[in-house]
Amino acid sequence: VKDVEALFGSRVFTRATMRERLPKNVYKEVIKAMDCGGELSPATADVVAKAMKDWAVENGATHYTHWFQPLTGITAEKHDSFITHPDVDGKMLMEFSGKELIKGEPDASSFPSGGLRATFEARGYTAWDITSPAFLREDATGVILCIPTAFCSYKGEALDTKTPLLRSMEAISQQALRIVRLFGNTEATRVIPSVGAEQEYFLVDRDNYLKREDLIFAGRTLFGAPAPKGQEMDDHYFGTIRERIGAYMKDINLELWKLGVTAKTQHNEAAPAQHELAPIYDQANLAVDNNQIVMEKSEAQAGLRKTMR
């Protein structure tokens, strides 16, 4: 890798990208909403949406999705293309409005909160998390603009794991500011919780994996002789990473760096075939989003099946 600095965040709609593409007054309004809360005006949202769409299309994107985290343990999404009805000359237009950026209306009946209700009764609404940057995901389906969102009901009840997190962060900030004021600081306006969510995982050769129904159906070993402690020779915590495992880690790092994930530390773990990836601490909701990206990218990586527990 010749230039990690240039690679890092290259698939993310960062503040630097917004500064380049948004009018100065719009950029300031967006940053204020990100740092201090509040809503964007419809006109501002339209400008941001157009800039985001233009950036995504220039990088090969054809669709966008509101990327959210329902009560299933993994992320969910629905893809919509940027195309609109052709004009009178039959020319296809690509558009993305502020309304489409800020809010979506997916069917929530298939999620745990849906119960036995019909699809038209179990509505769910996605709401843009402006503090978490949009990013581009590229795979066999193409290049998709992923917009991190919260997921709630018509009346505002949380239907996901992110909404309670955002509300908790706000509550912590409000109460922590009271303590900050006691120490004489009158300038601070916000206290931001941070998280460093390391991932420990097992790498199992595909041929061996397919022989174990417990791994296939449960994601863990349920039968067989207990493994020895190991670590007596060169397979310990600080042991040299095997070349095949190292190649996997290298590929993961490159993908994560493109998406702005600060993958920092990698090493063997205590159990046989166990390894770890740890990012740098980040703002709590960003760390949670990045953790989902880590799991998605890791599980999709080349001929190895990874189990995270």
Language model regions located:
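N-terminal-biased segments
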Residues: V1-R15, S41, G246-T262
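Glycine-rich, acidic/polar active-site loops that bind/position phosphate-bearing ligands
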Residues: R123-R309
